[in-house]
Amino acid sequence: GIGGKPVQTAFVDNDGIYD
């Protein structure tokens, strides 16, 4: 979730949602 965008990927980034 770069910039907080909830993009569904195989990983969870620092946003705590998706990459």
Swiss-Prot record:
UniProt keyword annotations, A-Z: Antibiotic, Antimicrobial, Cytolysis, Glycoprotein
Processing after translation: Glycosylated.
Glycoprotein recorded as keyword: yes
Source organism superkingdom: Eukaryota
One GO term (biological process): defense response to Gram-negative bacterium
Function: Has antibacterial activity. It inhibits fish bacterial pathogens, A.hydrophila and M.luteus, and also E.coli, P.fluorescens and S.aureus. Forms large ion channels responsible for disrupting the cellular envelope of bacteria leading to cell lysis.
This protein's name: 27 kDa antibacterial protein
Organism expressing this protein natively: Cyprinus carpio (Common carp)
